[in-house]
Amino acid sequence: MQISSLQYSCLISFIVFIGSTYIVLTSQNINLFGQTDTEVEQPMVNDTRLQIQEYSSGFKFPTGMNFLGPDDILVIEKNTGVVKEIKNGTVIGTVLDVNVANVSERGLLGIAISDKPRYVFLFYTETDKIDGGKILGNRLYRYEYDNGKLVNPKLLLDLPTIPGPSHNGGVLKMGPDKKSVYLVIGNLNYVQNETFITKAQNNKDGPPPDGRGGVLRITLDGGVVDNKGILGDESPLNKYYAYGLRNSFGIGFDSLTGNLWETENGRSTDDEINLALPGFNSGWREVIGFSKDTPEFNPENLETFGGKGTYREPEFIWRDTIAPTSVLFMHTDNFGSKYKDNLFIGSVKNGTIFNFPLDKTRTHLALTGPLSDKKADTNHETASITFGRNFGIITDLELGPDGNLYVLANYKHDGTIFKISAKQGTN
């Protein structure tokens, strides 16, 4: 069945967060939340030295998680605006319940936790009185954790919600310096209206950036990092770390170099992995995928913000869409040298986790064989980079304080956290 770019965008919205019955991903019909246990393949990893445990479950459309401490996790739910605390795999309570818009990709979308001082950062589409009420904004708040509750909210960013309702992104990560917060936000599904297509979407004659279509970074208090913007001094341009993004659900930092890596969802093909250095331009709306595959691409049409922004080709693409989500670097010895410091990517299609080693410079992926051209032309070509599959709709990957891999996914009838660890005596 052929689907248009607009149809595909809408379908991915349902796939990732809504869980609509019998929706289409490429040509396959998938009943995501009407399955019986016998109809769902069990999660598996290719390495027989590793094991999978269902750590916790019962969440409603979870979109992110973060560790407060050993065996102490905060999980956010997209549609309810609820933040739950889990200790030793058991939900012990709700630490916060905020009012959110929850149509399509709006909702409670991102969480990050700083160490010193201990703050919890949340990104969500806020409404006035009830879930689904009057929309106030896409907002980044800072909270304090106190005795099982999140208190003392401080508004750090207030961003547009239109045109919407998809491509909100929302993933948060603490910077390598532990003193900054990074947020990825898409273009909010722009329409063919120049008002909504800003310079951050490579519209050189468009209006100034308004906070959409990029990676933003701020201090723990909401200020400009180092008191100087990468691309310019005007607000909110001074908060942009990267731009030219269409629709991303994943950012993560290389634990060895501090470099930021990002996943990008294509319109109907060419999902990307990008190395996002400061001032990175992902190329949207002029190009997605490799520029050589876009005959009409002209680099002169790219916005550079006076030479401060730089377009960079993707480090990898999937021709057949897989809807990449979470980005994680395996900074642990638990699984052995085979995986240590590799790049792991979660995805929607088949609930697959991909594993990529990096080259010696750690600015490129170490790809061989049919993947040496930096692209997967068929699903068969991805066998060598597949770590595990059948996890459902993966929304987050996190390393626990114990060095094990935790996978947050919409699996079967609800949200589940899986724990992947080495079998005793195998590492």
Residue ranges and their predicted role:
Residues 11-22:
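Hydrophobic membrane-insertion alpha-helices, especially the h-region
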Residues 32-45, 106-108, 177, 187-384, ...:
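Beta-propeller domain segments
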Residues 22-25, 29-191, 250-253, 259-266, ...:
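Acidic, Gly/Ser/Thr-rich repeat motifs that build Ca2+-stabilized beta-propeller blades
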Residues 1-13:
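N-terminal Sec-pathway targeting helices
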Residues 8-9, 96, 392:
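Hydrophobic alpha-helical segments and their boundary regions
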